[in-house]
């Protein structure tokens, strides 16, 4: 999302059969930690749906893996966190 060549790089990887996984989270701004303050889809500035469309157009048809490193979310009830993930994915993923 921050790389101006991202769409072209995704296409290149797809053309070479190198799209093996698609990990999803969002980047919160401002962030409190470079690794452990990721957000649910829709909480930050990453255009997840747009990137997903590029990945799928490049031939990826595997699972979308939600991967949210977050000290805040890890402290929550994980059943409730899972519900939030599902809701955010349906709306913004």
Task: Enumerate the predicted regions with their spans.
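Histidine-acidic metal/acid-base catalytic patches
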Residues: 1-93
């Amino acid at each position: 999302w921050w790389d101006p060549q991202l769409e072209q790089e995704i296409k290149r990887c797809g053309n070479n059969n190198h799209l093996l996984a698609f990990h999803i989270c969002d980047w919160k701004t401002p962030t409190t930690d470079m690794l452990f303050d990721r957000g649910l889809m829709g909480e930050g500035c990453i255009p997840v749906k747009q990137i997903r469309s590029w990945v799928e157009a490049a031939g990826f048809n595997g699972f979308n893996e939600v991967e949210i490193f977050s000290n805040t979310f890890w402290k929550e009830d994980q059943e409730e966190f899972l519900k939030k993930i599902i809701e955010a994915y349906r709306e913004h993923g």
